[in-house]
């Protein structure tokens, strides 16, 4: 019984699987329609309606099974009858595996997505139908054995595979798919699908259950992977499926069932939200990008293992294609992400509209309209997402197709192979589990899992050999295909080389033929001229003789006879002599004789010429002569010699016997009566055949010419026949008119037959260039020239591409701040780096290679930083000279990063030394013996001193950052120093509390130092960037300050004893410091982990800044509160007069802490002007004064009177700066050198610079220098002295709480934070009234500590969020305020138009027409002219991409002088134009001022045949001033920019002057123009703008000009003469434009904002229209002109007035 059941179940499971496969492969019955529906909501609604309709029809068909008619049966499902089978399940499985064919099974290894959903059911409803989830679509490509998943379905579902094909015949009721509509065409009978519950192990009678295992996707099982997987995918072991197919009249089912099962409508698909769809599209594009990276790595690996350039060439092309596709996918991903954000915003807006308070009808209608509008936008955006996804999939498919053509080498990864356990054994386990207890079921399930794992292991071993064989076979096939492809490519190249040689040879022959044709044409023209002269002389001779005969017989003839004789004379005179092939009249018979005058009647009929000869009334047209390319004149001189004789058919004057009488002689005249049109037609036919034959020979290969041999022979025969007809027409001499008509008809018939045959030949010929027969024979010569030009263009294009292929335009921009995306592909592409003892040269070589690596994006510039750090680790032991030698070998683009990181490593060593110093100090404090403590401190000082000199050198390299290095921890250091110095003595009883306080202070410093050291090391890790190094410099400097304060505190151990009353408050403050140290440690530890993690990003760094600032605020507040404890009892604490205790705010007298007497806190006497500190400070002051003076001189305009003197002073000041810098460094290293410095000399030098410092300011400066010696080095106090000449800034007055003081802004910039209002400072620092007590009470309880910390943290976090928003807004402002777009070009265009009007071509006609030029003098005798022109114009430029447009005005003047000789002009002109451009959408009146100075040289050359050539060359220098206002929070920052622009222009125009009868002149012109514009690097200055730098940009444009001008003469009015109107129009087209990217850096409040501008190219086509009026009075010419210039983004109006005086 068990065997029978097992047999039946196995057969039924096979049938069900085969049926499922058949339904998918025949028409994609379910999968294809659902693909389109999943992309939008409308398709999902269509799916639900269709499923309901299908379920209704199925229920009707099941209910009326007996009453409905049987539809037409196309086919049936054939199910074999059950047979007895005695084989075991394992034997059956082995037989099935052995029967499977590797090549014949097209659906093998194709995973089919699970089309059904598990639905829970009760144990009693085992046999009932289950709900079915509609299947998702999957396209199956049989040929390539790939599966393409639906673009909107990204979830991996369990799949199922069927090993064999079923026997299936499709019936009329099967659902079909309409390709056109992409939807269902469903018949009434749709198969119902039922599913049994996986929770029950019993099955209904006759229902098969197939055990399956879950499918585990392998790394190679990607949709776009070409590697065939031998492993059959597993199926789900928990899902037991049962399918039943039924139709209305059919009784053929899988198993007969006695009970009718009503169909259950399927559950509709759950639509994903728009945001989820966008996220999935981005993930799909990212998957495609990763796949491209893998392919790129495989291609590069194959290239390395391939030998020979010919073999590597297709692989290199494939590599370029993959790299280009990867770049496109990156762009698609970014665009899809942006669209996803927009969709998410719209979706959230819709949700907010749907929810909320109760609304009235008007509000509801408004919300509904907004919802509809948002839904439409979402649909459009989703369509764009779909297109992006399709584009990514298309690129993936193209790469797959290209990869098939080559053999790629990649590591062979064994795919896990699983095996389906036998159905019988699994079924037996199910039957046994039904009767077992719960514990037995658990044991059986565990045993089933063990059996399953064993079966999988056996399957892996069994299939590994087959997998290896399959891989090897595939590699052999691909290798063979690759070799075949290479052979084909090689053959093609050889053929192309041969064809190129043949074309070159043909071109040489063609050039020779053209030269011969020119020679023949010249000879024929000369012969024709001689022949015409001979005809004229012969006609005159005949007329003279006729005149003599007529004088003798005048009296005897009547009027009628005279008229008859006149007609005969006309026929005789008008008869042509002969063609070029006939002989001509002898020169000896052309002698003229004196004759008598004709009678009066004859004279009125026959006119005479100047010499008295008779002239014919009409002149007959000369015969059309065409010289063929293959006809040559053997001896051109023979044509001249042939003129001396006449042919036999022509009689001379002596032979005509005129003396016998006029009417009595019989005269026979021979004429050439053939139609000249036929001759012309024959010539065109011959020329066309010759051209087409040569084109076919040039554009076809030799192998193709062999196949076209018959057609070419026919064309050759037609060519010879046409030549024969042509020669016959030229030589035909016919007497009778009937013969003439017959001959003409026969020749025309032959020509038409030749043309029709030629049409057939050319239509049947298919060449590589797609040559077709041209029906228009009049354009054959034009077509020949065009074909030659096309060949030249193609050759030029090929040469250009070959150059680009050999010298690619690699990206030179190296971004030191990469992201994490795309790094895997680059790392895999570049390969692993060697790690060896001598790897320094290899690293250098690798860096040099990466310098020219074609990066896909800025994200992929991570690799140079990684290699740079590796190189640094190898060169850490080298000396500075050795390291400098290594750095010189590195590429200049990467060398700055290498040297910068070297300096950072040095600073890291200083940090380690300082940490060791702090540790020694702590140990010394804990040591009971004071002698040992002193020794420990001395040892630590020695250890730290080893790096002190190098640290000072490092400071010299960072002068611009010193302020923020030392300003940040200044207040903390002051408070700690004051605290330590305030203790004059310490009693023996208070030693222990004092030790604890010092230990707490040192512990806080050491913890901070160690954490900073760890952070420093993390910054040097590969995941760091140069920006993060700069952002952490403030905190690094804090690390240097803490140990110095600790040394001060340790030095006061033996001081006097303090009072007993301070004991308890000091212990509380120590607890607060301990708390701060623990919080700092935790925060820094979290930050350190986040920085070191590979997945960290810029966002995580920003998020950690809140914690960092939180820690700083706690330390500051605790230090100040700790110091305030002693202020009540001690009178010698050192504090600042201003009470500067907050960021961006100074408290007043009532809010500040008590200020003790400062006299006791001074270390040295402040009145001592000769102290070393004072002298060093004065040296710094003098250095800063020199810098300020130099900057003032540099801001002066270069056009001022003393520009040369200013330049010389600037050079001298720069030399002084260098000298002072070296002197200060030397004094810092050796303080003994300060003895040579004189206070009076420095003060005198300062007086000379205009920056004298008063004595009050110096005393204040000395007091501050005493309290904070480090402030001297950073230069902050010196800057305050220079900014205020009367006294140093002592603090601003108290303002309102919500205002931001300027000092706060400055200090906020120094700390990298925005200035906070007073209320924020009170919350953050807890130093207002009543807050000191709260800070002192931090140690009372843990709850109060946590609350205070939370308050401080929330305040800092809120402030940082505000700061980030304002930085983002600032970045947006900078991106919109683009640099100069084309303002300089606008000025140059205006100037060129003014000069071009002077250079209008003026042909000196005899009718004294209006001068063509704008103000040119009519009289050609004028040699010199002086002219002036004034202009005014407006222009408007629209917004281009993300750059703001502008409106501008231009006004200026031009003066010129030229010399004119016979309408040939040469002159020079100077122009000065002032322009103002105001940027649109600017609330701050931002504008740009340009002063342009242009020098132009122009000329005009008059050419023959009314042509004239104009040329213009100009060079200009533009001085540009930009005035821009930035909004940084509530602060308005005004910046001023001064820089220059150099522009060069050159143009040439060819004019043709055409004069009409009414003195109207039309002048068409054509020409070229080239323009080059170049901006210099500039620095921007302004309030709080520390630095703005703009890299040099350059713009090159080559354009063509085509236009025309019309001059209309007018009548003279008043004293004006030569009045005329001018109209002009021109079209300018840019052929080539080259622009550079602009990198702009703006530094505000110590925050750098970087913006990269890609200057958009100007529109290709521009138009210029103009009109004017011109007139002259005596020697003065006046003209008025107007021009209108426009293109896609730009409009300009310009008017001008010109006055010219002829000298």
Curated annotation (Swiss-Prot):
Biased composition (Polar residues): 149-164, 171-221, 232-260, 1155-1169
Comp. bias intervals (Acidic residues): 1291-1300
Disordered: region residues: 93-265, 490-509, 1146-1169, 1284-1305
Cellular component GO terms held in the UniProt record: cell outer membrane
Compartments, record wording: Cell outer membrane
Secretion signal, residue range per the UniProt entry: 1-28
Biased composition annotated in UniProt, kind: Basic and acidic residues: 110-128, 490-506
Annotated PROSITE patterns: AUTOTRANSPORTER
SUPFAM superfamilies according to UniProt: Autotransporter (SSF103515)
Residue ranges occupied by any Autotransporter domain in the UniProt entry: 1419-1703
Keywords assigned by UniProt, alphabetized: Cell outer membrane, Membrane, Signal, Transmembrane, Transmembrane beta strand
Entry protein name: Putative surface cell antigen sca1
Organism: Rickettsia felis (strain ATCC VR-1525 / URRWXCal2)
Gene: sca1
């Amino acid at each position: 019984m068990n065997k029978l059941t097992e047999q039946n179940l196995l057969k039924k499971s096979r049938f069900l699987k085969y049926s499922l496969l058949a339904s998918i492969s025949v028409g994609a019955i379910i999968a294809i329609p659902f693909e389109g529906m999943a992309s939008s909501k409308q398709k999902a609604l269509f799916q639900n309606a269709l499923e309901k309709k299908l379920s209704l029809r199925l229920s009707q068909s099941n209910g009326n099974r007996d009453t409905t008619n049987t539809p037409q049966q196309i086919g049936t499902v054939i199910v074999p009858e059950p047979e007895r089978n005695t084989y075991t399940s394992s034997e059956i499985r082995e037989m099935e595996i052995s029967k499977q064919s590797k090549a014949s099974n097209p659906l093998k290894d194709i995973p089919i997505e699970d089309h059904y959903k598990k639905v829970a059911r009760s144990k009693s409803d085992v046999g009932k139908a289950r709900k079915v989830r509609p299947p998702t679509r999957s396209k199956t490509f049989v040929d390539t054995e790939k599966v393409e998943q639906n673009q909107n379905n990204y979830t991996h579902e369990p799949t199922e595979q069927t090993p064999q094909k079923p026997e299936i015949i499709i019936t009329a009721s099967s659902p079909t798919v309409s390709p056109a509509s992409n939807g269902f065409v469903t018949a009434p009978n749709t198969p119902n699908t039922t599913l049994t519950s996986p929770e029950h192990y019993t099955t209904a009678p006759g229902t098969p259950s197939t055990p399956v295992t879950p499918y585990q996707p392998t790394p190679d099982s990607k949709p776009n992977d070409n590697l065939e997987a031998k492993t059959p995918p597993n199926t789900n072991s928990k899902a037991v499926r049962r399918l039943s197919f039924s139709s209305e009249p059919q009784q053929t089912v899988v198993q007969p069932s006695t009970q009718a099962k009503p169909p259950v409508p399927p559950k509709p698909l759950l639509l994903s939200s728009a945001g989820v769809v966008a996220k999935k599209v981005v993930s799909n594009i990212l998957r495609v990008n990763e796949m491209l990276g893998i392919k790129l790595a495989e291609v590069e690996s194959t290239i390395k293992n391939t030998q020979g350039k010919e073999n590597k060439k297709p692989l290199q092309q494939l590599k370029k294609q993959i790299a280009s596709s990867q770049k496109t996918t990156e762009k698609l991903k970014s665009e899809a992400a942006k669209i996803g954000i927009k969709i998410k915003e719209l979706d959230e807006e819709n949700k907010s509209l749907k929810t909320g308070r109760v609304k009235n009808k008007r509000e509801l209608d408004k919300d509904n309209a907004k919802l509809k509008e948002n839904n439409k936008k979402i649909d459009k955006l989703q369509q764009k997402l779909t297109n992006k996804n399709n584009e990514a999939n298309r690129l993936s498919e193209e790469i797959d197709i290209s990869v098939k053509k080559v053999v790629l080498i990649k590591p062979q990864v064994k795919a896990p192979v699983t095996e389906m356990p036998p159905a019988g054994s699994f079924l037996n386990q199910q039957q046994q589990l039904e009767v077992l207890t719960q514990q037995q079921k658990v044991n059986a399930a565990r045993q089933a899992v063990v059996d399953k794992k064993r079966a999988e292991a056996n399957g892996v071993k069994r299939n590994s050999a087959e997998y290896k064989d399959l891989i090897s076979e595939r590699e052999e096939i691909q290798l063979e295909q690759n070799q075949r492809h290479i052979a084909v490519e090689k053959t093609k190249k050889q053929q192309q080389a041969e064809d190129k040689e043949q074309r070159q040879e043909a071109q040489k022959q063609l050039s020779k033929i053209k030269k011969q044709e020119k020679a023949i044409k010249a000879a024929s023209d000369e012969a024709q001229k001689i022949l015409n002269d001979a005809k004229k002389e012969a006609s005159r001779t005949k007329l003279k003789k006729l005149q003599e005969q007529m004088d003798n017989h005048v009296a005897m003839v009547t009027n009628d006879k005279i008229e008859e004789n006149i007609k005969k004379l006309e026929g005789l005179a008008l008869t042509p002599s002969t063609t070029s092939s006939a002989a001509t009249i002898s020169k000896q018979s052309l002698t003229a004789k004196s004759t008598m005058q004709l009678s009066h009647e004859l004279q009125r009929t026959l006119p005479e010429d100047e010499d008295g000869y008779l002239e014919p009334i009409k002149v007959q047209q000369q015969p059309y002569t065409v010289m063929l390319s293959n006809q040559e004149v053997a001896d051109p001189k023979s044509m001249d010699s042939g003129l001396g004789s006449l042919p036999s058919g022509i009689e001379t004057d002596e032979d005509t016997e005129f003396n016998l009488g006029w009417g009595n002689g019989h005269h026979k005249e021979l004429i050439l009566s053939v139609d000249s049109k036929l001759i012309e037609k024959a010539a065109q036919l011959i020329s066309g055949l010759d051209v087409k034959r040569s084109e076919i020979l040039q554009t076809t290969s030799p192998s193709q010419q062999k196949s076209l041999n018959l057609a070419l022979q026919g064309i050759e025969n037609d060519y010879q026949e046409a030549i024969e007809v042509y020669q016959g027409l030229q030589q035909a001499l016919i007497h009778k008119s009937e013969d003439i008509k017959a001959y003409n008809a026969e020749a025309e018939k032959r020509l038409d037959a030749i043309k029709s045959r030629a049409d057939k030949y050319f239509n049947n010929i298919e060449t590589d260039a797609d040559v077709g027969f041209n029906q228009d024979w009049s354009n054959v010569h034009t077509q020949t020239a065009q074909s030659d030009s096309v060949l030249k263009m193609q050759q030029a294009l090929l040469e250009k591409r070959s150059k680009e292929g050999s010298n690619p335009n690699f990206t030179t921009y190296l971004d030191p701040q990469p992201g994490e995306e795309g790094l895997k592909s680059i790392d895999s592409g570049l390969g692993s780096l060697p790690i060896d003892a001598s790897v320094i040269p290899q690293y250098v070589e690798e860096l040099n290679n990466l310098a020219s690596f074609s990066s896909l994006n800025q994200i992929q510039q991570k690799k140079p930083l990684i290699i740079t750090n590796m190189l640094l680790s190898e060169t850490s032991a080298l000396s500075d000279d050795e390291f400098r030698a290594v750095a010189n070998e590195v590429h200049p683009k990467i060398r700055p990063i290498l040297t910068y990181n070297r300096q950072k490593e040095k600073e890291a060593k200083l940090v380690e030394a300082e940490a060791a110093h702090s540790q020694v100090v702590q140990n010394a404090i804990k040591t009971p013996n004071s002698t040992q403590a002193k020794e420990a401190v001395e040892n630590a000082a020695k250890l730290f001193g080893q790096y002190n000199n190098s640290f000072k050198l490092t400071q010299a390299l960072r002068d611009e950052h010193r302020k923020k290095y030392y300003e940040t921890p200044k207040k903390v250091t002051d408070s700690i120093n004051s605290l330590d110095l305030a203790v004059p003595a310490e009693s023996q009883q208070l030693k222990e509390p004092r030790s604890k306080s010092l230990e707490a202070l040192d512990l806080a410093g050491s913890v901070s130092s160690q954490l900073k050291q760890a952070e420093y090391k993390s910054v040097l890790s590969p995941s760091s960037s140069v920006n993060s190094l700069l952002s952490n410099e403030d905190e690094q400097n804090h690390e240097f300050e803490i140990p110095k304060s600790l040394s001060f505190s340790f030095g006061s151990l033996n001081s006097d004893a303090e009072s007993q009353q301070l004991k308890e408050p000091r212990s509380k403050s120590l607890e607060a410091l301990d708390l701060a140290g623990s919080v700092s440690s935790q925060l820094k530890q979290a930050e350190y982990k986040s920085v070191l993690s590979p997945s960290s990003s810029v966002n995580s760094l920003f998020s950690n800044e809140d914690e960092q600032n939180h820690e700083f605020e706690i330390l500051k507040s605790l230090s100040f509160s700790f110091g305030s404890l002693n202020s009540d009892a001690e009178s010698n604490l050192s504090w600042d007069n201003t009470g500067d205790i907050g960021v961006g705010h100074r408290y007043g007298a009532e809010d500040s802490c008590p200020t003790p007497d400062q006299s006791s806190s001074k270390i040295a006497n402040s009145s001592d002007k000769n102290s070393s500190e004072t002298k060093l400070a004065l040296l710094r002051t003098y250095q800063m004064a020199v810098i300020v003076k130099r900057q003032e001189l540099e801001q002066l305009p270069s056009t001022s009177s003393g520009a040369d003197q200013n330049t010389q002073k600037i050079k001298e000041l720069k030399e002084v700066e260098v000298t002072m810098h070296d002197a200060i460094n030397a004094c810092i290293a050796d303080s003994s050198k300060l003895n040579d410095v004189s206070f009076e000399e420095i003060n005198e030098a300062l007086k000379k610079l205009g920056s004298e410092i008063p004595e009050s300011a110096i005393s204040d400066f000395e007091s501050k220098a005493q309290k904070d010696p480090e402030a001297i080095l950073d230069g902050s106090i010196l800057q305050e002295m220079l900014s205020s000449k009367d006294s140093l800034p002592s603090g601003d007055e108290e303002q309102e709480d919500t205002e931001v003081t300027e000092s706060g802004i400055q200090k906020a910039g120094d700390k990298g934070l925005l200035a906070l209002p007073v209320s924020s400072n009170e919350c953050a620092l807890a130093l207002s009234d009543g807050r000191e007590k709260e800070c002192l009470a931090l140690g009372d309880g843990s709850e109060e500590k946590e609350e205070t910390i939370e308050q401080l943290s929330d305040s800092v976090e809120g402030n940082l969020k505000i700061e980030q928003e304002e930085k983002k807004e600032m970045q947006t402002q900078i991106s919109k305020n683009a640099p100069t777009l084309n303002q300089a070009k606008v000025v140059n265009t205006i100037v060129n138009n003014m000069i071009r009007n002077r250079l209008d071509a003026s042909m000196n006609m005899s009718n004294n027409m209006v001068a063509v030029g704008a103000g040119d003098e009519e009289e050609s005798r004028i040699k010199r002219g002086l002219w002036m022109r004034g202009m005014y114009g407006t222009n408007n430029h629209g917004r281009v991409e993300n750059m703001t447009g502008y409106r501008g005005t231009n006004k200026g003047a031009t003066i010129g002088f030229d010399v004119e000789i016979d309408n040939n002009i040469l002159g020079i002109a100077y122009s000065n134009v002032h322009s103002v451009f105001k940027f649109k959408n600017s609330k701050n009146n931002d504008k740009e001022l340009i002063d342009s100075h242009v020098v132009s040289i122009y000329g005009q050359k008059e050419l023959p045949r009314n042509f004239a050539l104009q040329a213009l060359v100009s060079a200009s220098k533009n001085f540009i001033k930009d005035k821009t206002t930035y909004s940084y929070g509530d602060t308005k920052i005004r910046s001023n920019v001064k820089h220059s622009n150099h522009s060069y222009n050159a143009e040439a125009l060819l004019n043709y002057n055409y004069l009409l009868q009414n003195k109207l002149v039309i002048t068409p012109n054509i020409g070229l123009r080239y323009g080059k514009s170049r901006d210099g690097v500039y620095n921007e200055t302004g309030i709080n703008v520390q630095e703005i730098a703009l890299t040099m940009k350059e713009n090159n444009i080559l354009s063509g000009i085509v236009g025309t001008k019309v001059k209309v003469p007018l009548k003279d009015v008043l004293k004006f003469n030569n009045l005329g109107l001018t109209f002009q129009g021109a079209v300018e087209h840019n052929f080539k434009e080259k622009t550079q990217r602009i990198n702009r850096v703006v530094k505000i409040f110590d925050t750098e904002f970087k913006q990269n501008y890609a200057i958009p190219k100007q529109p290709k086509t521009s138009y210029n229209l103009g009109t004017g009026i011109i007139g002259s009075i005596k020697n003065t010419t006046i003209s008025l002109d107007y021009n209108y210039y426009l293109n896609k983004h730009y409009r300009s109006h310009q008017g001008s007035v010109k006055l010219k005086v002829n000298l």
